[in-house]
């Protein structure tokens, strides 16, 4: 996490804690000629536009006070989206019983992607139901885990 991302995280936490929101991620990066500070938040039942506005106004005021960014930037506060990667233990817990896709660094059985129902997460291992059988994946070999969205 960059220094600016850490500052933004520290500044936003009080409003998140007060409202029982979860900080999913903070990004500070340049895209084209513009800099973006993106804050992704969530809560049980999902984030609303009003929630995003509340956090955005609060964080904008705090950033103006501290002024840690020398140049102009665009502040965005939003939900992480339905297909956000699962990173934290809580993300995995929320997705028990749901379909996920696992991408690996090193292939297993000549495959680097597996899809199945998440049945357990231990912190070190992900266990899914794959083709009717339990399959374990060591987190050290997992590059990405995301929910499977079916419409």
Swiss-Prot record:
The entry's keywords: Cytoplasm, Ribosome biogenesis
Source species, domain of life: Bacteria
Gene Ontology cellular component annotations, sorted alphabetically: cytosol
Coarse class of the protein's main subcellular location: cytoplasm
Gene3D superfamilies: Ribosome maturation factor RimP, C-terminal domain, RimP-like superfamily, N-terminal
Subcellular location: Cytoplasm
GO biological process: one example: translation
Family membership noted in the UniProt record: Belongs to the RimP family.
Record's function text: Required for maturation of 30S ribosomal subunits.
Protein name stated in the entry: Ribosome maturation factor RimP
